[in-house]
Design a protein with these regions (language model features):
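N-terminal signal-anchor transmembrane alpha helix
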Residues: 1-40
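Hydrophobic residues within alpha-helical transmembrane segments
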Residues: 10-13, 58, 90-94, 113, ...
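Helical transmembrane-bundle signal
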Residues: 12-22, 69, 73, 96-99, ...
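Transmembrane helix-loop junctions in multipass membrane proteins, especially transporters and channels
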Residues: 23-31, 79-80, 108, 131
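Core segments of transmembrane alpha-helices
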Residues: 59-72
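Structural signature of hydrophobic alpha-helical transmembrane segments
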Residues: 80-91
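Juxtamembrane boundary at the C-terminal end of a transmembrane helix
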Residues: 82, 124-131
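Interfacial loop-to-transmembrane junctions
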Residues: 97-120
């Protein structure tokens, strides 16, 4: 398997882990009765600060993973895999792994810098696919 596809697969598994890290405390914060409901009403109380941060980090990864997936597909189908695109794939993965604790624990300015590494890696992959 191309290294970019391996990084994408591992990034998806990071997403699953993030979902679990968020869902468990969210069920405790909001109660299982609410989380199993159709959610037609507002939550009975807000999420705890840490749980809310994990939720925002999860949503951010959904957004970032879309662009990274496009980059991996274009590089792979375009037969443009190279040491540069492989390095970018691993950089994206490392950034997404580090982003979770950075967001959860409020590491400033590191959270934004880590996010930037992931976006830059994705952008470089897209540009490399065009060259």
């Amino acid at each position: 398997m191309a290294p970019e596809l391996t990084a994408l697969t591992l990034a998806a598994l990071v997403q699953v882990a993030q979902f679990t890290l968020f869902a468990v405390p969210a069920n405790k914060d909001l109660t299982v009765d609410y989380t199993l409901s159709p959610r037609d009403t507002a939550p009975p109380k807000p999420l705890a600060k840490g749980t809310a941060r994990l939720g925002r980090a999860l949503n951010n990864h959904f957004e970032a993973l879309v662009l990274f997936t496009i980059a991996v597909v274009v590089v792979t189908l375009g037969d443009k895999s190279s040491p540069l695109t492989a390095t970018c794939g691993w950089a994206y993965l490392a950034a997404r792994i580090l982003y979770v604790p950075a967001y959860a624990f409020g590491w400033q300015p590191w959270r934004s810098l880590i996010w930037s590494v992931g976006l830059l890696a994705t952008t470089v992959m897209l540009v490399a696919a065009l060259l």
